Structures are given as C-alpha cells and as structure tokens.
Curated annotation (Swiss-Prot):
Gene: ydhS
Signal peptide bounds: none
Database matches in PANTHER family: BLR0577 PROTEIN
SUPFAM superfamilies (UniProt xref): FAD/NAD(P)-binding domain
InterPro entries per the UniProt record, alphabetical: FAD/NAD-bd_sf, HpyO/CreE_NAD-binding, L-asp_N-monooxygenase_NS-form
Species of provenance: Escherichia coli (strain K12)
Listed name of the protein: Uncharacterized protein YdhS
Length: 534
C-alpha cells in the first residue's frame, strides 16, 4: 500500500483526496493541517473571517464533491443560516454568501471523504493543529517533520497543498497589519485614521472588518444598505488607497459553464506559440481583437478597438472609470449589474474577456522577458479586473460607508513611498504626504519563489538546481533535481503564479488536486512549460 502525505487540508487538499478515492486503489494517506479543524481552509475559516466577509464564488461555480454547495445549504437548519443573515427561501445557485459558511461546507465534505476512504479500505490519519515544519527527500522516501511528537515515517509521495501564504501575525503591530489575515480579525481598531492599501475585495473586506467595530449595517427590503455609526466613533475615517483609485465592478450575469471561444482556440494559440516567442504577444492580441469584435462589434467600435494594441488596450478599458468619481461609477455599475441579473442579460464584451483570460494564460510561459512585462502591465490587469468582479452586497456596504462619510478613495499614482513607523504609517507621493494611525496592506497574494519555501530541507534541495521557480510536471510533481523527481507534488498556489498568473479560485484547486492525484499511479509524461526568467 503506497503511503501518501497531504500537507494542507484546505480546498486543494480536499480535492486531491477526492480524486485519490476515485482511483479505487487503497492507499495509506496522512493529512496534516496546521489549523484546529482540517477541511476548512484559511480563506473560509472563522478565525480569519467575520460573518460580513463574502466568498467571491457562487454554488454554480464550485466543483461539487458529494453535493453542490446549494444542495448542502438547503439541508441546513433555518436558524443556523439566519446566524449569517441568510434566508433559506431566498437561496439560489448564483448567490454570494459568507466565507465561513463555505468553510462549513468544505469541512462537512472533508469528513465524509475521510469516512468513505476508510470504507474503501484506505488507511487514513488526520493530524489537526499539526504544522509541517520541514520536508526532505531521502533514498528511503519523503520525510516530514512536524510540531507534534509523531512517529517517524517516510512517504512515497508528498502533496503540498498549503494554499495562500500570508505574513505571520508576529509581523503585525497595533498600528500595522501586513495583510488582513495577519491578526486583523482579533484586533481592536480604535476610531482613528485608517489606511488600507488595495481596492479589491480584500481591501473592502478589511474596511468592513474595521467598520463593524464602530457601528452596524442595516439593510431594508429593497436591498438598500445604511451604516449607523456608534456615537463614540466619530473620529473613524477609512481611506482605500491604490495606484489608480479605481474600484472593481460588481459581479455580472453570464452563462455558466462558459461558452466556447470562436477564434482564440487552443489550436490557434498553439499555432502562434509554435511560431516562436518573438512577436507572440502581439500576434495573440490580434486574435483577441477578432474574438472581441465577433462577440460585441458595437463595443469594439465604441472603444476604437482596431486602433488599439497590447499596450493601449488597458488604457481604453479603464478610461471611462478613471474619468468618473469611483463611488458614482460603483453606484451606476451596481444598478446596471442588478438589472442585468433580473433580466438574465449578458453583456457580450464583459463575458468574452472573462472567457479569454484562462485561454490566453497558456501563452505566458512562452513569452520573452520584454513581452512578459508588457503583458503584466496591460492585458493581465484587464483580465484580473474582469474576473475579480465583486459581490453586489460588498458594493452596497461600501456605498453605505460613503453615505456615512466614513470611507474615501485615494489614487497614489505610480510613484510613491511608504514608511512604516512604530506609531503610524506614512505614504509620500511627489506632491503630498498621507499619515495613518492604523494601516492594513490588502494587496493580495504575491508570487513566491524557491527561497520562500517554508520547509528548509526541501528549499535547500531545490536551491541546488539554481532555479528560482520550482520546476513541476503536468501533475505538479517536482522535476528537478533528478533525485526528487516525481516524489513531491507541489500544488501550492503562490509558487505557481509566475507562469499561471490567473491561477486562483476553487475550480483551479479542483483541477490541481485531480492532477496531483494522478501522480500516485502514473509519472508525469512532460514538464510544464515555465518562465525562463524572473
């Protein structure tokens, strides 16, 4: 019986276990989870989130395990759902709900998987509150070290499914939080001048986490939200900061599963890749232009799409939003999106960009360094803005804070400096200086390199190759050095973002988990293409 270690029991680890059970061959599986409860995952745990924080994914998009998320919700007691402000009679498969509820779903599915595994004669051990502190490959197998006094054993395959990586809480102070997941949920933030770097959903969630310490959101039957500030919190002022000062749009209605693309097909992209890296980005952009024109000729004409190139397309995409007050734009966009949802109307240009991002991602490892930078500054920002559209409820709460005179948005521009001091954080632009009593960095996950791997033994072994990015096969097993090949499946998202910049979400977790499970029975037939620079 092969011995498998799964490090991390969040969504990627859960989908890996799910896929292993489909193979029917009994295995010995040890699951290591540093949190108190395996099967929840950091993004959905009650330790890292408040009831206010919404998951940016609906049931219709979540790969089901035993049942869909919606089916699971419909089986819950009314009183339990009401604790999260959810009414059973209003549930539907496109609804955005509190992250903690989604964590409960995954916990339930995980426990059922463990039971099923044992019924299928798998040997399963689950270690909770158990942090893997080191991982090393020896001739005998993969050895793990943990913070618990566990018997020494070796594994045939170790699956690294550790998910997002945020700064330790030890790096946070009373006045500075390096991420919203570095102690902010437990912290008492006084009514003061609060700065939040980032205007994505993470930034908005951080603002909500602060705001609910100083008042409450009230929603009427017409979905209008107001914020009632506590009398003792008059000094609360929240500023969202970013280079552009642009807010994300509200999540829009579209057909799911996605309709196929007509021009930017796998065949067309592979043909361009085969022509070589020189000019690849510009050639693919011409395909993108044709795809957008096919989907929405009117919008294409309105933005003069034919006159745009890789570098100017992003400017055209954001132009109208930059000219408007961000809150006015958000209110207008919210009204449009909600109308489209009621009418089940799809905006063609938004939908085609959404479908393009995963297809176009395939060219990223094949770009030369110059074009990779152009892609990151242009098209990538458009794609991210489009797929990271946020729940309407988050926009309503943001607008409620604005009506209450609490929240503001500041565009810093491209050139600014940040000074983190003991009592405050100061940001300086060419023209101004901004000081904050409390500062929260909510810019999201950054790509990580070999030097950032938290397991000293594995890190040292990989550093001998001289590669800055882990070299993984199509099943995500490490390919270099030779003595490691096929023995560690490296599915930790932050280390995959260099050549998969849009790898995120539960669909990606399921796909990676399925691929890593294949490593148990069949070695990778080929390595993934990866960046030759970074």
């Amino acid at each position: 019986m092969k011995k498998i270690a799964i490090v991390g029991a969040g969504p990627t680890g859960i989908y890996t276990l799910f896929s292993l059970l489909q193979q029917q061959t009994p295995l010995s599986i040890s699951i290591f989870e540093q949190a108190d409860e395996a099967g929840v995952g950091m993004p959905y745990s009650d330790e890292e989130n408040s009831k206010m924080m919404l998951a940016n994914i609906a049931s219709i998009e979540i790969p089901p395990i035993y049942c869909t998320y919606l089916e699971w919700l419909q089986k819950q007691e009314d009183s339990h759902l009401q604790r999260y402000g959810v009414k059973k009679e209003t549930l539907h498969d496109r609804q955005f709900l509190p992250r903690i509820l989604l964590g409960e779903y995954f916990r339930d599915q995980f426990l059922r998987l463990v039971d099923q595994a044992r019924q299928q004669k798998f040997a399963v051990a689950v270690y909770e509150s158990c942090q893997v502190t080191d991982l090393q490959i020896t001739n005998a197998g993969v050895m793990l070290a943990t913070n618990q006094d566990l018997p020494s054993e070796t594994f045939d395959l170790a699956v690294i499914a550790t998910g997002h990586v945020w700064p330790d809480e030890e790096e946070a102070t009373r006045t500075y939080f390096p991420s919203p997941w570095s102690g902010l949920m437990e912290a008492k933030v006084d009514a003061c001048n609060v700065g939040i770097m980032g205007t994505s959903l993470s930034g908005l969630d951080a603002a909500m986490a602060v705001a609910i310490q100083h008042g409450s959101f009230i929603e009427d039957d017409k979905q209008h939200v107001v914020f009632h500030r506590d009398n003792a919190s008059e000094k609360l002022n929240i500023t969202l900061l970013s280079r552009t000062g642009i807010l994300p749009e509200a999540d829009f209605y579209c057909p799911i599963p996605y309709e196929p693309l007509h021009i930017v097909t796998d065949q067309a992209l592979n043909a361009e890749i085969q022509k070589g890296e020189e000019g690849l980005l510009d050639r693919v952009f011409r395909l993108i232009v044709e795809e957008i024109k096919f989907a929405d000729p009117d919008w294409s004409q309105r933005i003069a799409l034919e006159s745009l190139n890789v570098d100017s397309f992003a400017q055209a995409w954001f132009a109208e939003r930059k000219q408007r007050d961000p809150f006015d734009w958000a209110e207008k966009n919210l009204q449009e999106v909600e109308r489209n949802k009621r009418e089940k109307h799809t905006v063609p240009w938004r939908y085609v960009i959404l479908r393009l991002h995963e297809a176009v991602q395939e060219i990223v490892p094949h770009l030369n360094e110059h074009d990779h930078k152009r892609f990151s500054k242009g098209l990538a920002r458009v794609f991210i803005d489009n797929y990271a559209a946020i729940p309407s409820e988050s926009i309503r709460r943001l607008l409620a804070l604005r009506e209450a005179g609490i929240i503001h948005i500041l565009a810093l521009g491209e050139d600014y400096k940040m000074e983190i001091n003991e009592s405050r954080t100061v940001l300086k632009t060419e023209d101004n200086s901004y000081s904050f009593d409390v500062f929260i960095d909510a810019r999201g996950q950054r790509p990580l390199k070999v030097k950032d791997i938290p397991f000293p033994g594995l890190r040292e072994q990989l550093q001998k190759t001289g590669d800055e990015i882990p070299d993984v096969g199509e099943d995500y097993t490490l390919q270099q050095p030779e003595d490691i090949r096929g023995r560690v499946a490296f599915g930790a998202l932050p280390w995959l973002m260099h050549d998969q910049p849009f790898v995120q979400g539960l669909t990606a977790c399921a796909e990676i988990g399925e691929a890593m499970a294949r490593a148990v029975v069949k070695p990778a037939s080929r390595a993934r293409r990866r960046l030759s620079f970074d």
